[in-house]
Amino acid sequence: MLQTTWPQESVTFEDVAVYFTQNQWASLDPAQRALYGEVMLENYANVASLVAFPFPKPALISHLERGEAPWGPDPWDTEILRGISQGGESWIKNEGLVIKQEASEETELHRMPVGGLLRNVSQHFDFKRKALKQTFNLNPNLILRGGMKFYECKECGKIFRYNSKLIRHQMSHTGEKPFKCKECGKAFKSSYDCIVHEKNHIGEGPYECKECGKGLSSNTALTQHQRIHTGEKPYECKECGKAFRRSAAYLQHQRLHTGEKLYKCKECWKAFGCRSLFIVHQRIHTGEKPYQCKECGKAFTQKIASIQHQRVHTGEKPYECKVCGKAFKWYGSFVQHQKLHPVEKKPVKVLGPSLVSPQCSSPAIPPVLLQGSCSASAVAVPSLTFPHAVLIPTSGNFFMLLPTSGIPSSSAQIVRVFQGLTPTVKPSPVILTPSSHSS
C-alpha cells in the first residue's frame, strides 16, 4: 500500500555514469574506448527501462551514439575536487577517473577515492556494471516514480515500498508458507507468526490459564486450552456422535466419513486426509528429523518416537500390568505380556428359538410345541445357557449340542438345524462364542 510520504531516493543516469577529460580519453586504447561505450549505453538502457517517466537523453549518450568523443569540460566543480574528505582521504583530482556515487539516503554526491580500488579502466567498468545490478537488483517488479523505487505485484498490481513486503505479499498468491513449527509442523507465511505459535508449545504466551498457569499466544488458543480442564467438546460429529474440543480436529475427523484426502505428496502422489500424517510422510523424502535427543543426539522424524526413545535414558515404564504389577517401556511388550494371563471365561448363551428333537429334550427346559416346515414336530427352546458348548454334526440333518462343562453329559440334546440339507452334507463343528449372561 502506498504511503503519503516517502524518503527521497533519486536514481538517475548520472549515478551510474563515468566521465573522462580530453587527456584521459586520449590515454585509452581502442579496445578500452569500445568497452566504455558499451557499458555506458547498457547503463542508460537499464535506467531508461526502469524509470516510469520520460527524461532528456544525456549528452554523453548522444555523443556515443554519433560515434563522437565523449570528453568535454569536467562536469564536476573543480573546487570540490580539490577538497579533502572528512575522513582525511584525498579524492581523485586531475589523474585517474572521476565518479559520481550515491553514498547516503539524501543522495549526496561524493568522489570515489583511489585507494587501489580501481586499478584499470576495464576493472572500473566491471565494478560499475555490478554496482548497477546491485542498485536495481535486476528485479522485474521494480518501478521508478519521481525518482523513488517501488515494487509492484504482477498478479494484482498492488505496489509496495520495500521488496521484502512484496515477497511476503506474493505468498498470498502462491500459497507458500516457508516457516514451519518444529513441534507440530504447522506452516506460516511469516517468521513472526511462527514464533508466536511456538509459544503455545512451551507455555510462554501472554494469555495465562488460571487452572494450570500455562501461557498461550492468543485468546483463541486460551479458550481451546481451557476446554481440557472443563471437558467441553462443542464440535460433535453428526455421523457417529463423536465430539471434539477443536474445530480443526472435528474437520479432520469428518474426512474419515467422506473419504476426502486433501493432502497429496508431490513426490509419490500418496494422498492423506490428515495434515499431520502428510507432514510426517514428507520427511521420508526430505530426510528431515526435527526431533533430536539431547542425551545422545539421535534424531527422529516423529515426536512420539522421540518420547519413547527418552525412556531408554530415564528408565520410565508407563505401562503396568494390573494382574501381576510388571511394568513395560513399550506398549507392544505390554500387550504381548497380557496374553500370558488367562482371560476370564464367560458363559455361553445360545439364543433361541432353537429346533430340538422332542425325544431328547432336557427335563430342565420346558418344551414348547411348534409347527415346523418339516413334517416332524419340533420343540422351540427360548434359550440354552452353558459355560461352553460345541455343535457336532451327526448323521442326517441333526447336530448334537454338547456342553463341555457345567452340565451332566446326560443333558446332551439333539438339535435340528438346516432342515433342507441332505444327509450327505455334514458341516464342520462350530464353537459357540461366549457372551454375557442376560438376567
From Swiss-Prot:
Which terms under GO biological process does the entry name? Answer: regulation of transcription by RNA polymerase II
Kindly give the Gene3D superfamilies that the UniProt entry links to this protein.
6.10.140.140, Classic Zinc Finger (3.30.160.60)
Query: Which keywords does UniProt give here?
Result: DNA-binding, Metal-binding, Nucleus, Repeat, Transcription, Transcription regulation, Zinc, Zinc-finger
- Pfam families attached here? KRAB, zf-C2H2
**Molecular function as annotated in GO:** DNA-binding transcription factor activity, RNA polymerase II-specific; RNA polymerase II cis-regulatory region sequence-specific DNA binding; zinc ion binding
**Record flagged with keyword Zinc:** yes
- Output the superkingdom of the source species: Eukaryota
| Subcellular localization, as worded in the UniProt entry | Nucleus
Enumerate the residue ranges forming zinc fingers (C2H2-type): 151-173, 179-201, 207-229, 235-257, 263-285, 291-313, 319-341
> Has the keyword Transcription been applied to this entry?
yes
Q: Which GO terms describe its cellular component?
A: nucleus
KRAB domain spans which residues?
Answer: 11-83
Q: Which SUPFAM superfamilies match?
A: beta-beta-alpha zinc fingers (SSF57667), KRAB domain (Kruppel-associated box) (SSF109640)
Q: What does this protein do?
A: May be involved in transcriptional regulation.
Similarity-based family: Belongs to the krueppel C2H2-type zinc-finger protein family.
Q: What is this protein called?
A: Zinc finger protein 621
Which organism does this sequence originate in?
A: Homo sapiens
Q: What is the lineage of its organism?
A: Eukaryota, Metazoa, Chordata, Craniata, Vertebrata
Which gene does this sequence derive from? ZNF621
